[in-house]
UniProtKB/Swiss-Prot annotation:
Protein name in the entry: Spermatogenesis-associated protein 9
Annotated source species: Homo sapiens
Membrane topology annotation: Single-pass membrane protein
GO cellular component terms given for this protein: membrane
Source species, domain of life: Eukaryota
Its job: May play a role in testicular development/spermatogenesis and may be an important factor in male infertility.
Subcellular location: Membrane
């Protein structure tokens, strides 16, 4: 059954009572008029019980007179409409109430089971009877485990040391390789500067013209030959010195 909202229920109740509110209001006003004069007497009778029975008789008589004056058909219709609306409201609310009651019953049952369940300790203490062999072997086991842990620590330390040594050796080899490469480069530079560079001819081949034949020169004087050799050697030494100076400057710049 679908659950109806509260606004719809209130609307249905007002709709059922819309045609009968005037009759019920009139009946209530008549009852109030009849009992209006009796309110002070009722208060006095509550304080003293001497005139209790006559007051009850008069109130009953007046109530009967008021009920006789009220239109019975209107009152009955109003009561019937109230009963029908209350039944419809009860039918609408019955499934919700049943579901809530079932949920409450399940929750209460679960709580009762949890409360009545035997409480277990947080940890179970197991008592074991130790044998003589276990008592004797316990120190040996402890020493063996300590030795194993120490060996593990030594192996780790040895691995760290070996890695450090290998790193240093690698750095040394790299430095030697760099020094060797620098030496090879410097030697190549020296060789390049020491070799003479031939200059290209200043004029084209077409511009060279053959000269007319001349007679051979006379026999040169051999006495000037040692001087020429000495000048040539001094020129060669100056060229070598200049080449070495240039190579040294290039090495310093590198």
């Amino acid at each position: 059954m679908p659950i109806k909202p509260v606004g719809w229920i209130c609307g249905q109740v007002l709709k059922n009572f819309s045609g009968r509110i005037e009759g019920i209001q009139k009946a209530i006003m008549d009852l109030v008029d009849e009992f209006k004069d009796e309110f002070p007497t009722i208060l006095r009778l509550s304080q003293s019980n001497q005139k209790r029975e006559p007051a009850q008789k008069t109130s009953k008589i007046r109530m009967a007179i008021a009920l006789a004056k009220i239109n019975r058909a209107t009152l009955i219709r109003g009561l019937n409409s109230i009963s029908r609306s209350s039944k419809s409201v009860a039918k609408l609310l019955h499934p919700q109430l049943a579901c809530r009651l079932l949920e409450l019953r399940d929750i209460s049952g679960r709580l009762l089971r949890e409360v009545n369940a035997p409480r277990q300790p947080l940890y179970n203490i197991q008592v074991r009877k130790g044998s003589l062999f276990e008592i004797i072997s316990f120190p040996a086991k402890t020493a063996l485990t300590s030795i194993i842990y120490a060996s593990y620590a030594a192996l780790i330390y040895l691995a760290v040391c070996v890695n450090a040594v290998l790193k240093k050796v690698k750095n040394i080899f790299q430095e030697e390789e760099s020094i060797r490469q620098n030496r090879e480069e410097s030697e190549n530079c020296r060789k390049a500067f020491s070799e003479p560079v031939l200059s290209e001819p200043m004029f084209a081949e077409g511009e060279i013209k053959a000269k007319p034949y001349r007679s051979l020169p006379e026999k040169p004087d051999i006495s000037d030959y040692p001087k020429l050799l000495a000048n040539k050697q001094s020129n060669n030494i100056q060229v070598l010195h200049s080449v070495f100076d240039q190579s040294a400057e290039m090495n310093e710049q590198i």
